[in-house]
Amino acid sequence: MKEYDYMVVGQGLAGSSLALHLAWAGRSVVVVDQPARNQSSSVAAGLFNPVTGKLLSKTWRADELFPYTFEFYQRAERTVGGTFFHPKPIYRPFLSIEEQNQWMSAGPEWQPYLERVSPTSTFGGQVYDPYGGMILKSCGYVDVNRFVRGTREWFGARGSFVDDFVDDVQPMDQGVEWKNIRAKRVIFCTGCALPPVLSFLPVRPLKGETLTVKFAERPNLIYNRAVYAVPADPFYTIGATYQPTKWVPGITAEGRHELEEKLKSLIKIPFVVMNQKWGLRPSTPDRRPMLGTHPKYSNMLFFNGLGTKGVSLAPFFGRQMAFFLERMGQIEGSVNINRFKTLYSKFE
C-alpha cells in the first residue's frame, strides 16, 4: 500500500492546478486520471481575457484573478518545464460609434487592461473594424494540452501519476483507500464525469465546439469579437459555440456553420477548416466554481465547475483549495458548495 497526503482525481485545469499547489506546499500527492476521458481541457483554446460578454464588461474578479494567472503559469513553466503560457494582446473591434465613445472615455479602473483605444480602423487589412477598436493587455492564452501533459509527466517522473479511472474510493476514519493507494484526503476534479458519491452536485454540462483553421496569412494579434482566433501552431483555434441545453454528443454541421459565419464577419483573411472538435465544460447554476467537502465524508472533497473560464479560475481557486486543505484559509462563500444548501438535505 502506497501512502500519500493527497489523492487528486482528474487532471484537467482544476486537477493540475490543485496538484501543483499541494506539491509546492511540500505535500505528497498522487494524481489519478485517464487523459482520454478528458472532454473539456483537451479541446480548450486556453484564452484568458479580462473583458467579457456582449456588453464588454470586466470579467468576474478580474483584478484578483489575472495577476495570479500570470504568476501561476510562469511558476508552473519553471516547475514542469516547457513553454505553454503566452501573454499576448487581444484586439476587439467596436461595433458602433456608441461603443467607441464608451471606451474612449473609459475610467481608471480599466487602466490595467487597456493598451490602446483607437477611433479609426487599426487592423483593417485583416479584420472588419470600421469604428476602430481596443487593444487589451493582461491577456493571452495557455496551451492547455501542453500544460496538462507537462504536469502529468512531471508527476509521472516522480511515480505519482496513475493512468486509471476512479469511481469507487473507499472512505475510512483516517483517510481513503483506492486499490493500492491510501491517502489522507481525496479531491475529485473530474468536471462533468462525477463519481456516484458526488452525483448530488449541480454540475451542468455545457457543450462547446471549436474549429481548427489554417489562415492564408498570420493574424497580427488575437482577434476576439463574438468568436476568437487563438494560435494553435501552426494553425488557429476558432471558438466556441455555447450550448447549455438540448445538445447532442459530437461535432455538428450547425456548430461548424455558426463558427465559420462568425469568423467571416470578424476576419478578412481567407482560411481553410482543418478540424472540428467538441467538449463538455463543467458549469454550475450561478456560473461560479464549486469547492467544498462532501457532507458525509470529511476526507472527500471536490473542486469543479470552472466553466468557460477555467484558465483564469483554476490557478486562483486551486490555491484557495490548497490553503483550505492545509488549514491556511477558508473557502469563500461565493464558491463554497454550502451556497447550494438544499443539496445537503438528504445527508442530514
For each predicted feature, which ranges?
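Beta1/beta-strand and adjacent pyrophosphate-binding region of the FAD-binding site
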Residues: 2-14
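Active-site substrate-recognition segment that forms the wall
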Residues: 14-25, 34, 42, 47, ...
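Dinucleotide-binding Rossmann-like beta1-alpha1 core, especially the glycine-rich loop
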Residues: 47-125, 130
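Short beta-strand to alpha-helix junction loop
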Residues: 56-68, 134-150, 250-254, 312
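C-terminal catalytic lobe of FAD-dependent flavoproteins
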Residues: 275-348
